[in-house]
Amino acid sequence: MEKSKVSSESLIGRESELRHLHMAVRNRQSQLIWGPGDAGKTFLIARMLAELPEGERRKCICWAGPASRRELLEHVIRGLYFAGDPLVHEKVRADRFTEANLARWIDKQSALRLRGILFTATERGEYRLFLDHLSPVSHAITELLKQIVYRAKTPVYLTGRGCSQAEIGSAWSLYWTDEYRIHLGPMPENAARELVEICIRRFGLDSLDLGGFREDLLHLSGHLPGSIVKMCELAAEPRYHYGDQVKMRLLHVDYLLQGKRFSSPSSYAS
């Protein structure tokens, strides 16, 4: 999962959500982390993972982007192998394969056998699965996720831009109540302003004439941390300067166009 170029400061105003996610991970409770684009869903997960002990982090299997049922199943098996799962290693060795040709071994297996290995390997309840930018989730993948959650005893942490069927597909049935949801909305006013000041320093914008820049940025970003960071990063580029002023209208249009490109089915948004 890709991390933002602004480090821990991007988590300003998200401390409560981070605690909630840590608690859910400790309790092995599946969660939907939902909110608009650039609300910080990817960064929240990355920050939480970075704070886990190394042993626990190795057993967190992460996927980003769209996937078919088969692709997701193969990725989980691959994740179990690299997490050092003894059963998966035993199966690979028994078929006279190694890490060097693991992909070929996985490709040769039927979906039925891969599911059997997955369920047996995870029955001790040691792993966690994080899925970013997968939505909307098809019925077939939802059925696999339900098997992973209920049969394989493995919690699934999913990101989405909403919590309804229209936004995350059939997966809504896994996260049907607020108990299984973490909502990331706009940041509080004071936190958003603090992040703006940090980004101004980080991207060297304090040498520009920022009259009106802060208020325009807060308004156009909707107090979303990813929007603040990305627009400040763009503001550092000379093409958005008119003398020592920032051309906010052009910058905002380009930021929106970037967002549309990154949210297309073939790319990974942040």
State the predicted function of each range.
Residues 2-5, 69-98:
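Conserved NTP-binding/hydrolysis module of P-loop NTPases
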Residues 8-21:
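N-terminal pre-P-loop "Q-motif" helix
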Residues 28-46:
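Walker A/P-loop nucleotide-binding motif
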Residues 32, 44, 128, 185, ...:
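C-terminal alpha-helical "lid" subdomain
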Residues 35, 130-174, 178:
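Sensor-1/coupling segment of RecA-like P-loop NTPase cores
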Residues 52-67:
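Conserved catalytic segments around the Walker B and adjacent sensor/switch elements
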Residues 85-144, 148, 208-220, 227-228:
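Mid-core helix/loop region of P-loop NTP-binding domains shared across ATPases and GTPases
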Residues 171-200:
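Conserved AAA+ ATPase core "coupling" helix
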